């Protein structure tokens, strides 16, 4: 069996050494070289033709993002960003995913052990290789379509940045009209006014979520999201989405009450579920082992939703490797919720949605574009 050829690019000799040893000690991987900067890396990519590259963002002579952009344009290879990204640089990690990085892994820091990070990197290298052809073909196709549209929207959004504040104020006024019919409906069955939208995503999800949320507006029910991401990245990702969308988008906090028109992104490194408190739905953050290799796990979110929100849920499972979310989606469907899996054509990695379809967990299979209308319709229904 051919081994997966890996090139390690990092300006730190220590990191190169640690990663090299980890790669060499895995029976499925072959370390074909290391590089201290993008210029050396470029030559080695041409000469050695690696299957997967690990790349640091902060490097001398050329930063990792510029290099990533060039590689994805001229010589696309799955690239995993391995970087000690501080809070202020998290935007660079989000940008890397937009530019086509397969995934992002945080270097060991704080309570995160070296062993845990190494396991994560090895897992991601294998996953990226397994998905290589499909991922690169999809990336090329989608970067031409909705990523270029996103860029246009971002440019327009920066001009109309102030518009959001005005819209939010009006949205707030319109968000809580006192409606006696609503109240009587609410009292007759708490469930009927508790509409909720839940979304799960992994590889390719950052771009998919940007696309969804830049195309949604208006008075939608609360939206809860699990996007697989390392701790500390999710806060910055939520900020970024918030800048691009007229919806209020934030990182979820434990025990906060869900509001209409607000999107709650699960923090990295901890599971998110929902709990009911006096008729209100609240965020429940809790620790625990990884589920389907993930924390936060989509299954954990969907599972808790199936218990507390019953049939008043629209749940969408987007692009991503593996099968996290498929079982949870089935539970929501069995409780009478409406479930949607992303179609193969619009998914960068068709793993999680495919698993859901195999489990017969999806009421509907839809493109990312159609999901916008499904969400809007559900919000109005």
Model-found features: residue ranges?
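Conserved acid/base catalytic micro-environments in cytosolic active-site loops
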Residues: 2-4, 13-24, 39-40, 46-47, ...
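Conserved beta-strand positions in the Rossmann-like core of class I SAM-dependent methyltransferases
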Residues: 7, 32-33, 340
């Amino acid at each position: 069996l051919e081994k997966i050829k890996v090139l390690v690019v990092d300006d730190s000799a220590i990191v190169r050494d640690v990663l090299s040893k980890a790669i060499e000690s895995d029976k499925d991987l072959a370390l074909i070289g290391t590089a201290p900067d993008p210029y050396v890396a470029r030559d080695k990519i041409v000469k050695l033709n690696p299957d997967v590259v690990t790349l640091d963002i902060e490097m001398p002579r050329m930063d990792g993002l510029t290099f990533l952009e060039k590689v994805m344009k001229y010589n696309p290879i799955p690239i995993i960003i391995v970087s000690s990204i501080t809070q202020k640089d998290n935007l660079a990690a989000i940008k890397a995913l937009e530019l086509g990085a397969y995934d992002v892994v945080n270097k060991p820091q704080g309570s995160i052990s070296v062993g845990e990070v190494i396991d994560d990197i090895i897992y991601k290298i294998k996953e990226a290789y397994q998905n290589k052809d499909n991922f690169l073909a999809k990336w090329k196709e989608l970067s031409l379509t909705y990523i270029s549209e996103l860029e246009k929207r971002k440019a327009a959004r920066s001009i109309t940045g102030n518009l959001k504040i005005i819209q939010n104020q009006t949205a707030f006024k319109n968000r809580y009209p006192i409606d006696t019919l609503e109240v009587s409906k609410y009292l007759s069955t708490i469930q009927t006014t508790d509409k909720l939208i839940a979304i799960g995503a992994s590889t390719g999800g950052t771009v998919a979520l940007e696309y969804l949320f830049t195309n949604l507006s208006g008075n939608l029910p609360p939206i809860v999201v699990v996007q697989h991401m390392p701790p500390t990245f999710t806060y910055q990702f939520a900020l970024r989405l918030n800048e691009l969308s007229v919806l209020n988008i934030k990182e979820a906090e434990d025990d906060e009450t869900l509001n209409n028109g607000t999107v709650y992104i699960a923090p990295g490194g901890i599971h998110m579920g929902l709990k009911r408190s006096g008729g209100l739905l609240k965020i429940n953050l809790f620790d625990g082992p990884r589920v389907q290799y993930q924390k936060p796990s989509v299954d954990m979110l969907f599972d808790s939703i199936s218990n507390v929100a019953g049939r008043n849920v629209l749940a969408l499972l987007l692009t991503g490797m593996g099968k996290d979310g498929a079982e949870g989606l089935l539970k929501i469907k069995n409780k009478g919720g409406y479930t949607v899996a992303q179609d193969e054509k619009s998914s960068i990695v068709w793993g999680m949605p495919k698993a859901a379809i195999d489990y017969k967990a999806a009421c509907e299979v839809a493109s990312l574009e159609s999901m916008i209308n499904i969400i809007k319709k559900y919000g109005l229904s």
